[in-house]
């Protein structure tokens, strides 16, 4: 019997609010981000799910989101595995810069290429392809076997690390994944078949406000 995989992007962080490239830097959630995470947890509580294990990154904004979701479903002490493989895309030299300042320094077109191309990394950083090259193997070795054994698994992570998973799960092209934005705090519930393909997907909230 296959299990359930739930993906949740962390709530708004301080640097999201300030329009900064975040990457592997470690800002906390804003008050809105906390409320977004709680809302995602409530949606999962209303859905009626109980998790067997949770996975998150080593960054505080994802860890706090994970804990707030678990609090909401009444599983505050659930085993949670933290791994760097689930970290956000590393923006390298862009990390910590205001996005407008980055455009002024390198030009709007170049920054757009770094942000929205699939395989062109910023200086010292990762492309979306590079991010997927660490996220997907970790999923295959550590997360997927738990789901295929019938467990209900929570993954609270980041926009680009989760897009790397969604790209394969939803069978999206490079062009499609570049246009996909995931809303903060909105759970995506996947039921998987025994062959690891997707049997069904439900989005518990509104993705229209994704950025």
From Swiss-Prot:
KW DNA repair (keyword) present: no
Pfam annotation, one family: His_Phos_1
Example of a GO biological process term: glycolytic process
Active-site residues from the entry: 10, 88
Top EC class of this enzyme: isomerase
HAMAP family: PGAM_GpmA (MF_01039)
Function: Catalyzes the interconversion of 2-phosphoglycerate and 3-phosphoglycerate.
Family: Belongs to the phosphoglycerate mutase family. BPG-dependent PGAM subfamily.
Binding partners and assembly: Homodimer.
Protein's recorded name: 2,3-bisphosphoglycerate-dependent phosphoglycerate mutase
Species whose genome carries this gene: Rhizobium meliloti (strain 1021)
Gene designation: gpmA
């Amino acid at each position: 019997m296959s299990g359930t995989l739930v993906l949740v992007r962390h709530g708004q962080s301080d640097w999201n609010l300030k329009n900064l490239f975040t990457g592997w830097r470690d800002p906390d959630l804003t008050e809105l981000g906390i409320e977004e995470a709680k809302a995602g947890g409530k949606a999962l509580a209303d859905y009626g799910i109980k998790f067997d294990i949770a996975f998150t990154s080593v960054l505080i904004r994802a860890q706090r989101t994970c804990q707030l979701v678990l609090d909401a479903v009444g599983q505050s002490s659930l085993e949670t595995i933290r791994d760097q493989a689930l970290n956000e895309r590393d923006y390298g030299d862009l990390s910590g810069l205001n996005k407008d300042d980055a455009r002024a320094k390198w030009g709007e077109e170049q920054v757009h290429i770094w942000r929205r191309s699939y395989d062109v990394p910023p200086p010292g950083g990762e492309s979306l392809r590079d991010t997927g090259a660490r996220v997907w193997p970790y999923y295959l070795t550590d997360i997927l076997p738990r789901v295929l054994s019938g467990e209900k698994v929570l993954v609270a992570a980041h926009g680009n690390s989760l897009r790397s998973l969604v790209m394969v799960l939803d069978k999206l092209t490079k062009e499609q994944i570049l246009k996909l934005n995931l809303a903060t705090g909105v759970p995506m519930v996947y039921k998987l078949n025994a062959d690891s393909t997707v049997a069904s997907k439900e989005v518990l909230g509104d993705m229209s406000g994704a950025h």
